[in-house]
């Protein structure tokens, strides 16, 4: 994996307004290729807004976002996958009336020539094999034929991850990947994230402090829309400002 000093994602002087309310205040930071980074902060810190800006959900009011040196600040969200960026959102987004295998196959088909009406049978066989491989990767091989709507919540989240991986992303953005999960499901998801981090850059938003402290190499702490601190878990634990506004609340 490329672990050079060149950032895979660079946020430069980003601010975001909603009317007169300023949700993000002049945030500048870089994300290195190969790093697993968590964005944390108390409620109202601006985490969701920041995630939406870097994932293309909303454009910054000022400042820029660059992916591999390319300005993506105003890129249409549907072009992110082709650029090499995949997203997994807090609210599970799967086709509940389709099987787990069909969900992943649909995601794979969207990455191929979508305007080709007639495809060789071999192409479908290849897509099916790739879908099976992704289901194995996320631990859903035994649920291949189950309807997505019949899967447990944690399994649906894992299925969504498989769909996100269908585009072979260099960067995976995850919003609250363990939201609504049982302790057992959380362990499974965090293990999956750890495995994926060996192959790609991951940026996630997460409220469960103990999980990110033990999993991530780097943390960003937001507070009232400002970047309060960034660094290793040890750096964040020892930061007096972080203790005051966030860690001290738990």
Give the ranges of each region predicted by the language model:
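Glycine-rich phosphate-binding loops of nucleotide-dependent enzymes
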Residues: 2-250
